[in-house]
C-alpha cells in the first residue's frame, strides 16, 4: 500500500433480524467509484442491546456469508459465525494481507440469526481507499 495515495476508510453494512433462530436478512454494499478498497479488518455488533455484547468477549449472535457479485466469487465457503469472522470492537479480525476490491464492487451480505433475539447488525469493513 502506498501511503501517499491512500486514506483510512470504513464501509458499514446494516441488517435487522427478527427474534427467531434461523431468521435471515441480506444487505448489498456497492463500493465507491473513486478508488479501490483494501480490506484490512472486520468488526461487528449484532446483539439485542449493547449490554448483551459488552460483557461477552466473543459474541455469537449471527452468522454471515459474503459474495462478491461483481466477480461471482464467494468470500467464504459457507456462513461464518460472528465470533469467528469479526469478534467485537476489542478483538477485531485483521487480515494478514489486505483484500483489494475494485471500484464499484458489489458485495452481498447474507445474515442468519443464531439466537432467539432481535438482532440489529452493523458490520464494519476497515481498510484503505486507494485513490486512482
Residue spans of the language-model regions?
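Beta-strand-centric surfaces of beta-sandwich/beta-rich domains
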Residues: 1-132
